[in-house]
Amino acid sequence: MEVEAAEARSPAPGYKRSGRRYKCLSCTKTFPNAPRAARHAATHGPADCSEEVAEVKPKPETEAKAEEASGDKVAGSAAKPRPYACPLCPKAYKTAPELRSHGRSHTGEKPFPCPECGRRFMQPVCLRVHLASHAGELPFRCAHCPKAYGALSKLKIHQRGHTGERPYACADCGKSFADPSVFRKHRRTHAGLRPYSCERCGKAYAELKDLRNHERSHTGERPFLCSECGKSFSRSSSLTCHQRIHAAQKPYRCPACGKGFTQLSSYQSHERTHSGEKPFLCPRCGRMFSDPSSFRRHQRAHEGVKPYHCEKCGKDFRQPADLAMHRRVHTGDRPFKCLQCDKTFVASWDLKRHALVHSGQRPFRCEECGRAFAERASLTKHSRVHSGERPFHCNACGKSFVVSSSLRKHERTHRSSEAAGAPPAQELVVGLALPVGVAGEGSATPAAGAGLGDPPAGLLGLPPESGGVMATQWQVVGMTVEHVECQDAGVREAPGPLEGAGEVGGEEADEKPPQFVCRECKETSSTMTLLRRHERSHPELRPFPCTQCGKSFSDRAGLRKHSRTHSSVRPYTCPHCPKAFLSASDLRKHERTHPVPMGTPTPLEPLAALLGIPEEGPA
């Protein structure tokens, strides 16, 4: 919508005398001030272009009076030619200044800054309307939240966020909108008017400002800074939503459960949890989603598109948030700190998961065996032991696995064999220590392994005083794939090759090609454990030195763990005795030395189910 400002010597009937007048170029109505002109501009239908204001030379007083007397302002305006056509959209204008003013809506140029807050505007009349907000001229106040507006039309658009009203429906796709300007922008997408494309990922936009916002997701630029907490954002709208958290403002409240939200989109997604509505359908797999962001993220998984690129290491990501989190690995930024042990984390959910270690909470309990877990994902993996579900399948050989990490380890055997030009050698289960009498029938069990020693009784879930063969002697099991069969699912499986395969497995294990390559000298190792042991000889791969003793580490986590040896901090306390430990893994090892009540699930139970070992009590 375009509104022109004109000089007038006499006011229109019913208005105060004013030196400037504002005229609508769609219907040629005139107004005595900018706010009234802007309110009127919003009343025109969605077919008009986005709100623009052009300042032109004033008409003579006689011509203005003649037009008012004739009452034929609309016809007179429509009869004039519009020789200045926009090359980016179908609009045309009578004068070159009007076209230049309109062109700012495509380029995103905002040459008129607010002297109070620095906000910039495309047109001077929009700046004048904005300045009224600094002067306190906000007569239109929302009844549902503290927001106020200088124009009634803006208040009506805002109130639709509370009521859920979306009167502007797209005839092509059915999508509806509350704001007519957003609806007009959406209509351009159907017209194919997306002249601004991203050079990195090819995504196209109808407006230059939208492209600029998108480009920040690639560059990581976040120019909008919160004055309260220092957090930065790539969009001003994101900063506005964030600032509501500090102000404790949640203007969007669910009528069903009373929960409040800072953003309209979050409120709308929440509403679907009550209705069960999932309007976003994936055409490839039929999966449905309740919010568009989850749907877009799911689609990228099908397409394999990872448009967000890390400049330092070359890694690609599907989401800008994932890239932002990954960048903390390079910068060392770990903003989430545990208040009990001073450990820091890259992501908030890592801190929440870590906090369960101190609290001892395990809210997710297995209904089959009673074992409890700190995370729902761990319970889901554990439940597959009971159900026999193995949802992760190898595309090369058809083998199935309980967890995705096991599938990834298995797939490496195919890749290494293809690189060596030979079929994969027969896999072995080697070096797996099991007590005598537990290996099951039909398994080839050689003599007891020398030097293994007696296992701690707690590792097998047995009290020290309980005798029997299960707590006295261990053997090394070396059996080929045909000996490993799950009795529940009937799927044969073996873990990847372990250390010592050449000693027990015979000649076939020697034929297996190396899998892991040193980053520094390209020397190959058959296992990741051997590779890590070898890489310790390269000081270049251990860039994190201890300032107290000079010992260096390959990662920051190893340095933090080592630093505790110089201090008295031992954050992990045993719930059964007063002992404390430097790490959670040391605590778990120690807990196994305590007697375990009969029938308590132990870490060996999933392994026993995998190998088809019958569940028996201690002898």
From Swiss-Prot:
Positions bearing N-acetylmethionine: 1
List of residues that carry Phosphoserine: 10, 387
UniProt key word Ubl conjugation: yes
Xref: SUPFAM superfamilies: beta-beta-alpha zinc fingers (SSF57667)
C2H2-type Zn finger ranges: 22-44, 84-106, 112-134, 140-162, 168-190, 196-218, 224-246, 252-274, 280-302, 308-330, 336-358, 364-386, 392-414, 516-538, 544-566, 572-594
Covalent S-S links between cysteines: none
Region listing for Disordered, in residue ranges: 34-79, 492-513
InterPro entries noted in UniProt: Znf_C2H2_sf (IPR036236), Znf_C2H2_type (IPR013087)
Localization in the cell: Nucleus
BP terms from Gene Ontology: DNA repair
Predominant localisation class: nucleus
Keywords linked to the UniProt accession: Acetylation, DNA-binding, Isopeptide bond, Metal-binding, Nucleus, Phosphoprotein, Repeat, Transcription, Transcription regulation, Ubl conjugation, Zinc, Zinc-finger
GO CC entries: nucleus
Biological function: May be involved in transcriptional regulation. May play a role in DNA repair process.
Sequence similarity: Belongs to the krueppel C2H2-type zinc-finger protein family.
Annotated protein name in UniProt: Zinc finger protein 668
